[in-house]
Protein backbone atom coordinates (compact mmCIF):
# COMPACT_ATOMS: atom_id res chain seq x y z
CA UNK A 1 0.00 0.00 0.00
CA UNK A 2 2.88 2.37 0.67
CA UNK A 3 4.17 1.79 -2.86
CA UNK A 4 0.74 2.67 -4.24
CA UNK A 5 0.96 5.94 -2.32
CA UNK A 6 4.15 6.70 -4.24
CA UNK A 7 2.34 5.97 -7.52
CA UNK A 8 -0.44 8.38 -6.55
CA UNK A 9 2.13 11.13 -6.01
CA UNK A 10 3.46 10.56 -9.52
CA UNK A 11 -0.02 10.60 -11.07
CA UNK A 12 -1.13 13.73 -9.24
CA UNK A 13 2.03 15.52 -10.36
CA UNK A 14 1.17 14.68 -13.97
CA UNK A 15 -2.40 15.88 -13.52
CA UNK A 16 -1.47 19.18 -11.95
CA UNK A 17 1.50 20.04 -14.17
CA UNK A 18 0.30 18.74 -17.54
CA UNK A 19 -3.49 18.39 -17.35
CA UNK A 20 -4.70 21.87 -16.39
CA UNK A 21 -4.18 21.62 -12.62
CA UNK A 22 -6.30 18.48 -12.21
CA UNK A 23 -5.81 16.06 -9.33
CA UNK A 24 -6.34 12.46 -10.37
CA UNK A 25 -6.15 11.02 -6.86
CA UNK A 26 -6.76 13.87 -4.42
CA UNK A 27 -10.42 14.72 -4.94
CA UNK A 28 -10.36 17.34 -2.19
CA UNK A 29 -8.24 19.54 -4.44
CA UNK A 30 -10.69 19.20 -7.33
CA UNK A 31 -13.68 20.01 -5.13
CA UNK A 32 -11.96 23.13 -3.78
CA UNK A 33 -11.05 24.28 -7.31
CA UNK A 34 -14.62 23.79 -8.48
CA UNK A 35 -15.94 25.70 -5.49
CA UNK A 36 -13.71 28.68 -6.24
CA UNK A 37 -14.51 28.56 -9.95
CA UNK A 38 -18.25 28.45 -9.26
CA UNK A 39 -18.17 31.77 -7.41
CA UNK A 40 -15.95 33.46 -9.93
CA UNK A 41 -13.42 34.11 -7.21
CA UNK A 42 -10.56 32.80 -9.29
CA UNK A 43 -10.09 33.71 -12.93
CA UNK A 44 -8.69 31.08 -15.22
CA UNK A 45 -9.46 28.19 -12.89
CA UNK A 46 -10.14 24.92 -14.73
CA UNK A 47 -13.64 23.47 -14.64
CA UNK A 48 -13.86 20.73 -17.25
CA UNK A 49 -10.86 18.78 -16.00
CA UNK A 50 -11.84 18.69 -12.31
CA UNK A 51 -15.44 17.77 -13.16
CA UNK A 52 -14.35 14.93 -15.44
CA UNK A 53 -11.78 13.72 -12.91
CA UNK A 54 -14.29 13.77 -10.06
CA UNK A 55 -16.90 11.82 -12.03
CA UNK A 56 -14.33 9.29 -13.24
CA UNK A 57 -12.91 8.80 -9.75
CA UNK A 58 -16.38 8.03 -8.42
CA UNK A 59 -17.01 5.60 -11.28
CA UNK A 60 -13.75 3.76 -10.58
CA UNK A 61 -14.45 3.56 -6.85
CA UNK A 62 -18.01 2.34 -7.44
CA UNK A 63 -16.82 -0.34 -9.85
CA UNK A 64 -14.22 -1.62 -7.41
CA UNK A 65 -16.75 -1.55 -4.59
CA UNK A 66 -19.13 -3.68 -6.65
CA UNK A 67 -16.41 -6.21 -7.42
CA UNK A 68 -15.37 -6.44 -3.76
CA UNK A 69 -18.90 -6.41 -2.35
CA UNK A 70 -18.88 -10.11 -1.39
CA UNK A 71 -15.12 -10.52 -1.07
CA UNK A 72 -13.54 -11.76 2.13
CA UNK A 73 -11.46 -9.26 4.11
CA UNK A 74 -7.84 -8.89 3.13
CA UNK A 75 -6.06 -9.65 -0.11
CA UNK A 76 -7.83 -11.88 -2.62
CA UNK A 77 -7.77 -12.63 -6.33
CA UNK A 78 -10.33 -9.85 -6.80
CA UNK A 79 -7.95 -7.31 -5.29
CA UNK A 80 -5.24 -8.55 -7.60
CA UNK A 81 -7.54 -8.28 -10.62
CA UNK A 82 -8.57 -4.74 -9.72
CA UNK A 83 -5.02 -3.50 -9.14
CA UNK A 84 -3.92 -5.26 -12.31
CA UNK A 85 -6.66 -3.37 -14.13
CA UNK A 86 -5.41 -0.12 -12.59
CA UNK A 87 -1.93 -0.87 -13.91
CA UNK A 88 -3.26 -1.60 -17.39
CA UNK A 89 -5.30 1.62 -17.47
CA UNK A 90 -2.21 3.58 -16.45
CA UNK A 91 -0.18 1.82 -19.14
CA UNK A 92 -2.74 2.70 -21.81
CA UNK A 93 -2.84 6.28 -20.55
CA UNK A 94 0.94 6.50 -20.76
CA UNK A 95 0.77 5.51 -24.42
CA UNK A 96 -2.01 8.01 -25.16
CA UNK A 97 0.11 11.17 -25.54
CA UNK A 98 2.42 9.36 -27.94
CA UNK A 99 -0.51 8.22 -30.09
CA UNK A 100 -3.01 11.08 -30.04
CA UNK A 101 -1.03 13.80 -28.26
CA UNK A 102 -2.08 15.88 -25.27
CA UNK A 103 -2.18 19.33 -26.84
CA UNK A 104 -5.95 19.86 -26.90
CA UNK A 105 -8.33 20.37 -24.00
CA UNK A 106 -10.28 17.27 -25.01
CA UNK A 107 -7.17 15.09 -25.01
CA UNK A 108 -6.12 16.43 -21.62
CA UNK A 109 -9.61 15.83 -20.21
CA UNK A 110 -9.59 12.28 -21.54
CA UNK A 111 -6.21 11.62 -19.97
CA UNK A 112 -7.37 13.09 -16.66
CA UNK A 113 -10.47 10.91 -16.82
CA UNK A 114 -8.54 7.67 -17.25
CA UNK A 115 -6.06 8.57 -14.51
CA UNK A 116 -8.86 9.43 -12.08
CA UNK A 117 -10.73 6.24 -12.98
CA UNK A 118 -7.64 4.22 -12.08
CA UNK A 119 -7.08 6.13 -8.84
CA UNK A 120 -10.71 5.63 -7.79
CA UNK A 121 -10.43 1.87 -8.24
CA UNK A 122 -7.11 1.86 -6.40
CA UNK A 123 -8.52 3.86 -3.48
CA UNK A 124 -11.53 1.54 -3.13
CA UNK A 125 -9.27 -1.51 -3.19
CA UNK A 126 -7.01 0.02 -0.54
CA UNK A 127 -10.09 0.78 1.56
CA UNK A 128 -11.10 -2.89 1.35
CA UNK A 129 -7.61 -4.02 2.38
CA UNK A 130 -7.93 -1.63 5.34
CA UNK A 131 -4.29 -0.87 6.04
CA UNK A 132 -4.63 1.68 8.83
CA UNK A 133 -3.85 5.29 7.85
CA UNK A 134 -2.81 4.31 4.31
CA UNK A 135 -5.52 5.29 1.83
CA UNK A 136 -2.94 5.57 -1.01
CA UNK A 137 -4.58 8.72 -2.44
CA UNK A 138 -4.55 11.31 0.37
CA UNK A 139 -2.47 11.91 3.48
CA UNK A 140 -4.70 14.32 5.41
CA UNK A 141 -6.00 11.60 7.74
CA UNK A 142 -2.48 10.18 7.94
CA UNK A 143 -1.06 13.52 9.08
CA UNK A 144 -3.92 13.90 11.56
CA UNK A 145 -3.17 10.54 13.16
CA UNK A 146 0.56 11.20 13.15
CA UNK A 147 0.17 14.49 15.02
CA UNK A 148 -2.66 13.41 17.33
CA UNK A 149 -0.83 10.27 18.51
CA UNK A 150 2.60 11.91 18.79
CA UNK A 151 4.28 12.85 22.07
CA UNK A 152 2.88 16.35 21.71
CA UNK A 153 -0.62 14.89 21.43
CA UNK A 154 -2.03 11.74 23.00
CA UNK A 155 1.46 10.19 23.22
CA UNK A 156 0.23 6.83 21.95
CA UNK A 157 2.95 6.51 19.35
CA UNK A 158 1.05 3.90 17.35
CA UNK A 159 1.77 3.58 13.63
CA UNK A 160 4.16 6.54 13.54
CA UNK A 161 6.61 4.81 11.21
CA UNK A 162 3.91 3.72 8.76
CA UNK A 163 2.31 7.16 8.71
CA UNK A 164 5.61 8.93 8.23
CA UNK A 165 6.48 6.57 5.38
CA UNK A 166 3.14 7.25 3.66
CA UNK A 167 3.68 11.01 3.77
CA UNK A 168 7.29 10.72 2.61
CA UNK A 169 6.37 8.44 -0.27
CA UNK A 170 3.63 10.64 -1.68
CA UNK A 171 6.07 13.58 -1.56
CA UNK A 172 8.73 11.46 -3.26
CA UNK A 173 6.23 10.33 -5.88
CA UNK A 174 5.22 13.91 -6.64
CA UNK A 175 8.87 14.91 -6.97
CA UNK A 176 9.61 11.97 -9.26
CA UNK A 177 6.53 12.76 -11.34
CA UNK A 178 7.57 16.39 -11.74
CA UNK A 179 11.05 15.36 -12.87
CA UNK A 180 9.73 12.81 -15.35
CA UNK A 181 7.23 15.33 -16.72
CA UNK A 182 10.18 17.46 -17.80
CA UNK A 183 11.03 14.62 -20.16
CA UNK A 184 7.48 13.50 -21.06
CA UNK A 185 4.26 13.09 -19.11
CA UNK A 186 3.79 9.63 -20.63
CA UNK A 187 7.03 8.51 -19.03
CA UNK A 188 5.79 9.58 -15.60
CA UNK A 189 2.51 7.69 -16.00
CA UNK A 190 4.44 4.64 -17.21
CA UNK A 191 6.53 4.73 -14.04
CA UNK A 192 3.37 4.77 -11.92
CA UNK A 193 1.99 1.86 -13.94
CA UNK A 194 5.14 -0.18 -13.27
CA UNK A 195 4.80 0.42 -9.53
CA UNK A 196 1.15 -0.67 -9.47
CA UNK A 197 1.81 -3.78 -11.55
CA UNK A 198 4.74 -4.72 -9.30
CA UNK A 199 2.52 -4.41 -6.21
CA UNK A 200 -0.10 -6.57 -7.92
CA UNK A 201 2.42 -9.29 -8.75
CA UNK A 202 3.91 -9.32 -5.25
CA UNK A 203 0.50 -9.35 -3.57
CA UNK A 204 -0.77 -12.19 -5.74
CA UNK A 205 2.37 -14.22 -5.08
CA UNK A 206 2.11 -13.71 -1.33
CA UNK A 207 -1.57 -14.73 -1.12
CA UNK A 208 -2.49 -16.84 -4.16
CA UNK A 209 -4.94 -19.23 -2.53
CA UNK A 210 -7.97 -17.07 -1.75
CA UNK A 211 -10.63 -16.30 -4.33
CA UNK A 212 -12.33 -13.47 -2.48
CA UNK A 213 -15.54 -15.29 -1.58
CA UNK A 214 -16.59 -15.46 2.06
CA UNK A 215 -16.00 -18.74 3.82
CA UNK A 216 -18.98 -21.11 3.88
CA UNK A 217 -17.37 -23.99 5.77
CA UNK A 218 -19.72 -25.88 8.13
CA UNK A 219 -19.21 -25.54 11.87
CA UNK A 220 -16.82 -27.87 13.61
CA UNK A 221 -19.25 -29.14 16.27
CA UNK A 222 -20.29 -32.34 14.36
CA UNK A 223 -16.65 -33.28 13.88
CA UNK A 224 -16.03 -32.88 17.60
CA UNK A 225 -19.03 -34.98 18.49
CA UNK A 226 -18.09 -37.74 16.05
CA UNK A 227 -14.55 -37.88 17.37
CA UNK A 228 -15.42 -37.87 21.05
CA UNK A 229 -18.54 -40.07 21.13
CA UNK A 230 -16.77 -43.38 20.26
CA UNK A 231 -14.09 -42.68 22.79
CA UNK A 232 -16.66 -42.03 25.49
CA UNK A 233 -18.61 -45.12 24.59
CA UNK A 234 -15.56 -47.35 24.48
CA UNK A 235 -14.27 -46.06 27.79
CA UNK A 236 -17.50 -46.10 29.79
CA UNK A 237 -19.58 -48.99 28.46
CA UNK A 238 -17.25 -51.92 29.31
CA UNK A 239 -16.41 -50.61 32.73
CA UNK A 240 -20.09 -50.18 33.57
CA UNK A 241 -21.02 -53.64 32.42
CA UNK A 242 -18.10 -55.35 34.10
CA UNK A 243 -18.54 -53.54 37.36
CA UNK A 244 -22.28 -53.86 37.78
CA UNK A 245 -23.20 -57.22 36.28
CA UNK A 246 -21.17 -59.51 38.59
CA UNK A 247 -22.19 -57.72 41.73
CA UNK A 248 -25.83 -57.94 40.78
CA UNK A 249 -25.60 -61.61 40.02
CA UNK A 250 -23.73 -62.48 43.21
CA UNK A 251 -26.04 -60.51 45.42
CA UNK A 252 -29.35 -61.66 44.00
CA UNK A 253 -28.78 -65.28 42.99
CA UNK A 254 -28.39 -66.85 46.51
CA UNK A 255 -31.55 -65.26 47.81
CA UNK A 256 -33.66 -67.13 45.26
CA UNK A 257 -32.48 -70.70 46.28
CA UNK A 258 -35.21 -72.70 48.17
CA UNK A 259 -34.26 -74.69 51.31
CA UNK A 260 -34.11 -78.51 51.11
CA UNK A 261 -37.03 -80.42 52.62
Locate each region found by the language model:
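Long, intrinsically disordered low-complexity tandem-repeat segments
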Residues: 213-256
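Symmetry-related core transmembrane helices of the 12-TM Major Facilitator Superfamily/SLC fold
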Residues: 83-89, 93, 113, 187-204
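Helix-to-loop junctions at the C-terminal end of transmembrane segments
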Residues: 60-76, 176-177, 181-182
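Hydrophobic/small/kink-forming positions within alpha-helical transmembrane segments
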Residues: 54, 58-62, 91, 167-175
Amino acid sequence: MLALTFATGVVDAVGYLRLDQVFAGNMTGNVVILGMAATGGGTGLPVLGPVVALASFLAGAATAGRVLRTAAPGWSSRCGALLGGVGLVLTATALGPAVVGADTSGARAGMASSLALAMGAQAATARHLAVKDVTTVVVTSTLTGLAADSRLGAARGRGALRRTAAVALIVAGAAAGALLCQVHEGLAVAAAACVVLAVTALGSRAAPATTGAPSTAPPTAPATASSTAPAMASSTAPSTASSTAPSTASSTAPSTVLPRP
